[in-house]
Amino acid sequence: MITGQIIQTSIDELKAITKVDLGVYDLNGSEVASTMEKDDITTDLITGFAASPADSQVIGVHHLLKIRDEGDLLYVLVARGMTDDVYMAVSYTHLRAHAT
């Protein structure tokens, strides 16, 4: 399984490119890696989305995306913001996840 340090490095690099704050959370809502404050990201937000049938969802300023490995749900990615950059960053991540 991929380590938290690798995930942190990856989202730090993505933030440098996209200027979008990102967070990765496990299925219990615990932060694995983040470039943002967790102030308004609740455990209920993460666990509720993880349990839903949706692969991606926008809730307020949070764009949520399920991260799967060989079909198994492992993490939830959260991108924060309302700009087109956030939508494009999440869309790119979503497309890359389905391409592998």
Residue ranges and their predicted role:
Residues 1-62:
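Structured interaction and signal-relay segments at domain junctions
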Residues 78-90:
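Regulatory loop-to-helix N-cap segments in sensory/regulatory domains
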Residues 93-100:
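Conserved small/polar residues in nucleotide/adenosyl-binding loops
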Residues 35, 77-78:
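Short linear motifs in exposed loops
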Residues 57-68, 73-76:
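A short beta-strand signature within small-molecule sensing/ligand-binding domains used
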Residues 46-49, 88-92:
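Surface-exposed beta-strand edges and their flanking turn/coil or helix-capping segments
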